[in-house]
């Protein structure tokens, strides 16, 4: 399964913020520059992460962003479920767009459903804290 850039950027933002002190405010430009990502793309991502409670945004001259929850409370599987548009691996997963004549008898859909469930089950076992265990190395690479 391939994650969208939107989800990739969401996870990268969370990783970046998790390597900072909990009260430290970061601006979007710093994140964009560290990852060589468009600031405009990140603004959309951060807005959504804020609505979901993963980040806290503070407006104004001395504003910025920081994690809205402790890293150990941010589940990777949950983040991915919130940021991915859909999990329609193949056409038959989408009832409205399914035109495959094999759908009524096909065993592939069942196999792919099991694979998707296993994929998400693994992601559910990890938190942001697990992902940033090597914070010192991450900080070096991001600076």
Swiss-Prot record:
Entry-linked Pfam families: Rrf2
Note on how the cofactor is bound: Binds 1 [2Fe-2S] cluster per subunit.
Protein origin, superkingdom: Bacteria
InterPro entries assigned: TR_Rrf2-type_CS (IPR030489), Tscrpt_reg_Rrf2 (IPR000944), WH-like_DNA-bd_sf (IPR036388), WH_DNA-bd_sf (IPR036390)
GO terms for MF: 2 iron, 2 sulfur cluster binding; DNA binding; DNA-binding transcription factor activity; metal ion binding
UniProt: [2Fe-2S] cluster binding residues: 92, 100, 106
Domain HTH rrf2-type: 2-133
Needed co-factor(s): [2Fe-2S] cluster
Function: Nitric oxide-responsive transcriptional regulator.
PANTHER family the UniProt entry points to: HTH-TYPE TRANSCRIPTIONAL REPRESSOR NSRR (PTHR33221:SF4), WINGED HELIX-TURN-HELIX TRANSCRIPTIONAL REGULATOR, RRF2 FAMILY (PTHR33221)
NCBIfam families: rrf2_super
Name of this protein: HTH-type transcriptional regulator NsrR
């Amino acid at each position: 399964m391939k994650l969208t850039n939107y989800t990739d950027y969401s996870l990268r933002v969370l990783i970046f913020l998790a390597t900072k002190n909990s009260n430290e405010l970061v601006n979007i430009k710093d994140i964009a520059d560290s990852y060589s990502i468009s600031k405009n793309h990140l603004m959309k991502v951060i807005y959504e992460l804020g609505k979901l409670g993963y980040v806290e945004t503070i407006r104004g001259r001395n504003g910025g962003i920081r994690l809205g929850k402790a890293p150990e409370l941010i589940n990777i599987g949950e983040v991915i479920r919130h940021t991915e548009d859909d999990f329609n691996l193949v056409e038959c997963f989408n009832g409205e767009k399914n035109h495959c004549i094999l759908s009524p008898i096909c065993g592939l859909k069942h196999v792919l459903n099991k694979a998707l469930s296993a994929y998400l089950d693994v992601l559910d076992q990890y938190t942001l804290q697990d992902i940033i265990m090597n914070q010192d190395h991450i900080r070096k690479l991001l600076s």
